[in-house]
Amino acid sequence: MTKTLTNKLAEKEHAAVVTYIMGGDGGLDNLEEQLLFLEKSGVSAIEIGIPFSDPVADGPIIQLAGLRALKEQVSLEAILNKLAMSKVQIPLIIMSYINPIFHLGIPKFVELVQKTPVKGLIIPDLPYEHQKLITPELQGTDIALIPLVSLTSPKERLEEIAKQAEGFIYAVTVNGTTGVRSEFDAHIDSHLAYLKSISPVPVLAGFGVSSIEHVEKFAHVCDGVIIGSKVVQMLHEEKTAELGAFLQKAAEVRIKN
């Protein structure tokens, strides 16, 4: 069964734009408003980060957002309960470290997720080899377990991951944490083009994407982008008009590969 998320991101004319927000940054009561605003801005899907005290993959902007959410006593369960009432029509993606999921309990987590518009799951600290901790519970659901692949992964590993991939492949564009960047690795284009050539699902570039130029660059070699730190910062600074205009422009970028 092809997952809903794959179908949504596989549109070939325009680059898929997925935005990341930290769930509960600014309080849980703002979550639905943020989601509806991003949907109206033309994004393809929205990643919702779950605040965690030891976020190893997060850069400073997202770490601070997580701390703000933790101060509001935001939890994974509270976010899922809020999402169960969401009116959002585009797919949502939960991005959580494994610890909050274990704490809630994997069966309960999957049960709660299925009551929401969430169609994808990213667990940055769950290695590919240990996916079986959660895949049995996801079987038969419309929830895609999305793999992250790094710049340094050997080709055999990329091929193995691509073969099993669901939803989309999250291609990490830098060696390091998330955050706004001006430059990318010299080999990033060939890496993404190779991934796209072997992947049965869309390939999206993430970590450091923060300008229209970045979106246009990656539209030459993959299917779209994930924009995180820039979105988190602009929402925090309440620059919604500026952010909305940026995202609408990003969503109009045409795929050129």
Swiss-Prot record:
Superkingdom to which the source organism belongs: Bacteria
Signal sequence segment: none
Any one GO molecular function term: tryptophan synthase activity
UniProt keyword terms in alphabetical order: Amino-acid biosynthesis, Aromatic amino acid biosynthesis, Lyase, Tryptophan biosynthesis
SUPFAM superfamilies: Ribulose-phoshate binding barrel
PROSITE patterns: TRP_SYNTHASE_ALPHA
GO biological process, alphabetically ordered: L-tryptophan biosynthetic process
EC number, as in UniProt: 4.2.1.20
Enzyme class, first EC level, given as a word: lyase
Gene3D superfamilies in the record: Aldolase class I
Catalytic reaction list: (1S,2R)-1-C-(indol-3-yl)glycerol 3-phosphate + L-serine = D-glyceraldehyde 3-phosphate + L-tryptophan + H2O
List of catalytic residues: 47 (proton acceptor), 58 (proton acceptor)
An example Gene Ontology CC term for this record: cytosol
Pathway entry: Amino-acid biosynthesis; L-tryptophan biosynthesis; L-tryptophan from chorismate: step 5/5
CDD domains linked: Tryptophan_synthase_alpha
Function per UniProt: The alpha subunit is responsible for the aldol cleavage of indoleglycerol phosphate to indole and glyceraldehyde 3-phosphate.
The protein's assembly and partners: Tetramer of two alpha and two beta chains.
Family: Belongs to the TrpA family.
Protein name according to UniProt: Tryptophan synthase alpha chain
